[in-house]
Amino acid sequence: MISDESDRFNPRDPKPADAGKPSKSAKRREARKLATQALYQWHMAKHSLNEVEAQFRVDNDFSDVDGAYFREILHGVPAKKVEIDEALKPCLDTPLEELDPVELSVLRLSAWEFMMRADVPYRVVINEGVELAKVFGATDGHKFVNGVLDKLAPRLREAEVRANKR
């Protein structure tokens, strides 16, 4: 039998074109991180969204970031702020105004994803929110965020949550 040498692995061959490039989910994770920081800045400094976005695009390397998703979050969360806050209130034991601004930014981003991005599974939304709170929030902020998002998911994604509990 004749073997086909061309099908064998050759360590001297160049890597595939996409080797070492971040995946779509990794780029979205980076977009969420930057969006959390940008939403915090928008909330605290009261700059316009366009100013915040421009500053973030100048100050950060977007090569490993889903820039379109960053922009969608950054402009989408404030556009839905009233609806997001109304959805969050029944899941909180504390008034919104008393929440840590970082955790509030994470909760708003996650609530926006629940509402506007049905293509992102609810468990991914919760996990990403918890991870953002671990990176940017207070010591146990991720536990608080997890608890709120666990209450919020069935309110905003009832059918999906029910289907996943079977």
Curated annotation (Swiss-Prot):
Pfam families: NusB. Keywords: RNA-binding, Transcription, Transcription antitermination, Transcription regulation. Gene3D superfamilies: NusB-like (1.10.940.10). SUPFAM superfamilies: NusB-like. Residues 1-30 are annotated as: Disordered. InterPro entries: NusB-like_sf, NusB_fam, NusB_RsmB_TIM44. One of its GO terms (biological process) is DNA-templated transcription termination. GO terms for molecular function: RNA binding. The keyword Disulfide bond does not apply. It comes from the Bacteria. Residues 1-18 have a biased composition (Basic and acidic residues). GO terms for cellular component: cytosol. Involved in transcription antitermination. Required for transcription of ribosomal RNA (rRNA) genes. Binds specifically to the boxA antiterminator sequence of the ribosomal RNA (rrn) operons. Belongs to the NusB family. NCBIfam families: nusB. This is Transcription antitermination protein NusB. The gene is nusB.
